[in-house]
Structure formats: C-alpha cells, structure tokens
Amino acid sequence: MTSRYIPQLSFSFYRHRTIRADFSGGQITSDAGLLPLRAFDQRHGLTRSLAERVCDDRDDTRVSHPGLSLFRQRLYQIIAGYEDANDADRLRHDPAFQILADQPLGAPLGSQPTLSRWENSPAPRDLLKLQDALLDWFVKICGEQVRKRGEILLDVDSTDDPTYGQQQLSFFNAGYNQHMYHPLLIFERHTGCLLAARLRRGTAASNARIIPLLLRIVPRLQREFPKARIKLRADAGFALPLLYEFCEFFGIQYVIGIAANSRLQEKAQRLQRRLARRYRRTGHPQRSFSSFRYRAYSWSHQRRICYKAEHTESGTNVRFLVTNLKGRSRSVFAFYNDRGECENRIEEFKNGFAADRLSCHRFRANAFRLLLHSFAYNLVNLFRLQLPSSLRSAQIETLRIQLFKIGARIRETARCIRIHLASGWPFQDLFQAASLCNSS
C-alpha cells in the first residue's frame, strides 16, 4: 500500500525551539461552536420545517444527499462565513459540518454541482411556502414575547443587490447607478426577525409588490396575536396611497415618509419664516415640529402630516411624514427616526450573512438563495435572543469569534462521538451557557 506523503513546514521565529507543522492531526474542525445552534434548531424543528415545504421529485433509492441535509449544509456554512456554494467542495469532508447536516462521519456532503442543481430545483409554489416559513419561525419562537409586549412593529425597506453578469432580470437602476436586483425586506423591530424577503427585478420601484407581501403577513399576525397592536414604518419610497388605505383597513398604525411638494412647502412656510428670524437673532441652529391635515389629489380623504423644520447656516430644511398616529409631532418623528435600526439589520444581513451573494443565472434560483440567507439570518437571530443579555444584540461577526469558531478534535467510538474542544479557548463559559440552554 502506498503511504500518503504529508509535507512538513518549519518556522524559525520561536527562539526557544524549532517549530514543525503538518496536516496529520486527524479529524479536526474549526467550527465546533455551531453545536449549540444545531441543538436549538433541533429542539424547535426549524430546518426540518423547510425541507418539508419543498417538493423533492428525486428517486429516494438513488439520493445520496436528502433535501434536509442540503438545507442544513447550506445554512450552517453561510452562518460560519462560507457563503459561496464553491466553498462546499472544500468543506464537504469537514466532520463538524457532517454532524450538523446529520450525515454519517466520513460521508462526503453535497458538492458544488449538487448544491447548484438543488438551488435551481424549487418551483414557484415552493418559494411561496418557504416565504411563509419566515413568519412561522417568528410565531413559534417569539409568540410569547409578542403577547407580553402587545405590539408588533414592522419596518419596511428595500436594498440594492449589485449584479456582475448575465443574471435574469438584472437591470440598471439609475437611482443606485448600477446593475442590480432590488430585494424587498420586512423586519420586526423588537425581535430583529426578518419576516419577509422578496427578490425583485433591478428596475422595480421601492414600493413594488409591498401590498401582496403584506397580505401574506398581516392577516396571519392578526390571527395569531389578536390583542397586539401592529405598527408600520417606511421611508418616502413607500409613500403609496394604496399602502395608507391598506394600513387603515387592517387597523395598522403607520408612519411613512413623504416627499415635499409645493403644497406641503406652502403649509410649512410660516414656521420656516419664524425659525429663520430666530436664527438671525440668536445665531444658533433652530428646530421645530408641527402638523396639519392634508389631502393629495389621489387620496380619498385627509390625512395627518407631521413635519420637522430646521434652520442652520446652510439654510432651511423641512421633512414630512404621513401618519395616523396621535400625539406630539416631535414624538412621531422620534418614533420614525428609530427605524434606523432597520438599516443596521440590513447591513448585518448583507455583510455578515452575505445576502447579496446572488450569483446564479436564473432569477428563481437567486430568489431561493435570498431565502436561504434569510433563514440563516433568522436562525442566528432567534438563537441569540436566548443567549446571555450581553450577547443578545451581538452581530454575527462577534458570535463567530466568541462562539462559533472553536477548534476541536472529533473522535468516533463504538458508543458515541466525542468532540474535544480546544482547552485554551477563552469563551468556554459562553459555550457552556449556550449548550445548557438548548440541551435536550
């Protein structure tokens, strides 16, 4: 039998002794910290619920990689920072990911071609079922919190997803000055959960498809939480009369930005002149809030407009909101400005979970990819909600460093699989706490 040659590397910087390194350490992984997350997933049946929603037409007798295994392989590799399907070829022999995917040790996971075929397989009805799973996870895990709080706060926004090839429905968007997709996202503010993620063509308006998406969410939320108030916030890209009417019909309290026009500016002129006089007298920046009733030509009735006027050395600036909230205009603006947290969630979704890595050719495959990254985000977000308070708002990069990325030697015996974690790991207490929270 021919023995495999294992090259040795030498390092001479250590003055006490010569250092030699090789790759003969055996079954060692750098991602053993994902085990508590996998236990959390198992306890609530999260990834299993995804596989049950996708029709798999393959012959069971000839399938080496079941749909559930592929879901788990893809999600946990995204969470670990291996977002590209090409990474699968390098990780398919990693013992930790074999365990996470519930595959026998030594059985290779799906290759990059296998994952690519799988990502192109879901039908439109499968994508709709998966879209509903985002809401199902929220109801299942966060339902008790919502009932105690009595409020659901929806933050609606769109984001850019640059494209670099001949992807279907990738178009040039003049607003972003690039070829792109234009995903639509809905987050729940209090929990940070992503409730909806819809991929759209690059030229889609910010508010395109918002009503159909809300129709899949709002009635379900009202059935599950009949006593909870639902509120909605969005920027001026969603200043759509149909959206106002939708919110009013379903009893949703909303605050939505609205672009200035001559009629709105005329209504705010008196306050602007007053601030300008005060600024000339004091030399200090001035700010004030007020509101009035207004009806645009396309509106069926008057609505409340809150506005903020500022006067500085740069001149006067006025911003307008349309709302059905009561209370002081200053409080309405404070409530609206808090939607900046949604921008932080989107940044983590795109940068931490690489949700903008939609490089398949077919639009439907990229829509499926967006959902995969959405589930990876939600799995981690739901998991961190039950971590110690110091880590409940931790970004994914922090969780990778302090929890997920830990070296371990994996050894299979006749009775069990033993995972020997690094003795010098500085975050052992966190790992133990997360494991105890999710022990069966």
Task: Cite the ranges covered by each PLM segment.
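Short, surface-exposed basic-aromatic patches at helix termini and helix-loop junctions that form
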Residues: 244-253
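A short acidic (Asp/Glu
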Residues: 165, 240-245, 265-269
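C-terminal, non-catalytic "cap/extension" segments appended to globular domains
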Residues: 361, 366, 373, 380-440
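Dynamic "connector" segments at or just before major functional cores
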Residues: 1-205, 211-224, 407-440
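Short amphipathic alpha-helical "interface-anchor" segments enriched in bulky aromatics
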Residues: 40, 329-372, 376-383
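Acidic/histidine-rich, metal-coordinating catalytic segments
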Residues: 157, 227-238
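An anionic, glycine-rich sequence signature occurring as long contiguous blocks
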Residues: 4-19, 253-354, 436-440
